[in-house]
Amino acid sequence: MNERIRIREILAGTPAGTEVIVKGWVRTSRVGKGVAFLAVNDGSCLASLQVVAEPGLANYHELRGIGTGAAVAVRGIVAESPAAGQAVELHATKVVVVGGADEQYPLQKKRHTFEYLRTIAHLRPRSNTFGAVFRVRSSLAQAVHRFFAERGFLYVHTPIITTSDCEGAGELFRVTTLDPSAPPMADGAVDFSQDFFAAQAGLTVSGQLEGELFAQAFSDIYTFGPTFRAENSNTPRHAAEFWMIEPEMAFADLRDDAALAEDFFRYLCRHVLDNCAEDMAFFNEHVDRGLLARVEQVAGSSFAMMEYGVAIEHLKRAAVPFEYPVEWGLDLQTEHERYLTEQVVGGPVFVVNYPQEIKAFYMRRNDDGRTVAAMDLLVPKVGEIIGGSQREERYDLLESRMREGGIAPESLWWYLDSRRWGSTPHAGFGLGFERLIMYLTGMENIRDVIPFPRTPRHAEF
């Protein structure tokens, strides 16, 4: 029984009378009118295939008592189903129990909380909700690559281990081969010159800086890989390990950046609506009732643009109390972002040109001397989902911004050096892949959209 067909293909239109082999796991089983019914799922789609096992099978008595979670291989004939809700079923001619499952199997037929399912992350992909989440995640990852490939962007693999902190926040996970119980010392401090890389190294927080270097050779590039933040945060929106999508474009300014971000985000919204319809309908029914309407609205809308200063004025005039203060020079909080996108604009909006004091050193200083060419894309329900900027291409101003931010220019000499020869205006943005999945599925905790979440004090599996 080697030639198998995926259940998705059978349900999509395999003609009645066709002999097929399916392999999967029993979701439910029941006995009625002298036959056993097994609902078998192979992960290829949300729906299970009903297998009808009749008493003539050699192991019929075994199948009558088969447990939820058992793995089976089934040979049978596709037949039109008399039951409501399914077009076809499989009349088994042979069923092999590949791997049994007793009543101790944790995913019995009942509703489990997401909190409980996190404790059995090795099994939760077998549930309906997480099967849908990870099918959508896979499809979106493929869509990301397709979007950029169609537009001629080069895919760049940036390093996981780095000696630089792109955001300057000091949230690196350290990588060392030194003996923690007896590290070499020099002048009262750990002597990292004796470490593997002869310097302090850590896991990357972003591939942006290296991506910029490649944009100065290939014009349009993107990175898509894991990033790490040693941030001791236990919110539903933060994880220590997550994936980032970071395009960079040479010969581009902030408006070019916003245009790419809008095209990209709308493309991904349309992709899940068109290619993940069954799973999206499941999320709309069981996770977030307004999901489909919201994603459809974003996919079909044009995004607004608003100056940071104008956004502050809107917030000051708001007839609702905010938990966090609103003043020019303060960063926007989620409550402010949601008010702007939901109440002021009624759809997605780019907020642009932020005070330089609250943004990163690499963002291009505007001519007013107070703001930088930064942008955040705000969307209903979640607030900020994309952050980007035009990068500072002028050597002297970049060096000055680094010193102002307490970053030693010599520590990023190569980044500065790229501005010496053939420097061009360039821009890019970052989109957290998990936050994208949360937005497009309605899942409210980042731990539930990544296979094995890494958060403070949790690194199991």
From Swiss-Prot:
InterPro entries: Aa-tRNA-synt_II, aa-tRNA-synth_II, aa-tRNA-synth_II/BPL/LPL, Asn-tRNA-ligase, Asp/Asn-tRNA-synth_IIb, NA-bd_OB-fold, NA-bd_OB_tRNA
Record's keyword annotation contains Transmembrane helix: no
Primary location recorded for the protein, binned into one broad class: cytoplasm
UniProt EC number: 6.1.1.22
Highest taxon of source: Bacteria
One cellular component (GO) term of this entry: cytoplasm
Keywords: Aminoacyl-tRNA synthetase, ATP-binding, Cytoplasm, Ligase, Nucleotide-binding, Protein biosynthesis
Descriptive protein name: Asparagine--tRNA ligase
The gene coding this protein: asnS
